[in-house]
Amino acid sequence: MVKKISYIFFSILVFLDKVLKILTKRSFLIWFKDFIQEKSYKSINILDKEIKFFVPNQLLEWRVKTCLTKEPETLQWIDSFEKKENLIFWDIGANIGLYSIYNSLKNINSTTIAFEPSSSNLRILTRNISINNLEKNIKVVPIPLTNKE
C-alpha cells in the first residue's frame, strides 16, 4: 500500500514537473527544492562582508547567530596572527566552517585547512565554503586528526 501511494505521489510530481517546464521553462522539482531550502540560509556580517551560511537546523542557526560573540577569544586569537603570505591555519574539527571562513576573510593571503571527519558536517562545511566563493582559500580534509596511530 505504501509503495502504491509513493508511486502515485511520485507520478503526480513528475507530471507537474513536465507541465511547469512547458509553461515556465523551469523544473518544478528544482523550484520546490529551492523554495524549501530558502529559509535554511542565514546571512551575517563578518568583517564588513555579508556571509551566507547553510543552516538546516536550529542548533546551526544559533551557532551562526552567536559566532561573533560566543567565543570572542578564538576570534581575537585569529585576529592576532601575523600578516604574511605563507600563513597556514588549521581548523581542527571545522564543523560548519565558522572559523575557517572567518580566517580566510581576515587573513586574505592565508591558506586554511579545515579538518572535519563527520559526513553530515562535511556536507554543510563544503556548501558554506562554496556559497561564499572561498574554495581557493579553504582546503577541506575529511579525516580526523589524532596523536594515536
PLM region spans:
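Short loop/turn elements that flank and shape the SAM/SAH-binding pocket of Class I
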Residues: 146-149
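Conserved residues in the N-terminal Rossmann fold of short-chain dehydrogenase/reductase
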Residues: 140-143
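S-adenosyl-L-methionine
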Residues: 1-128, 132-133, 137
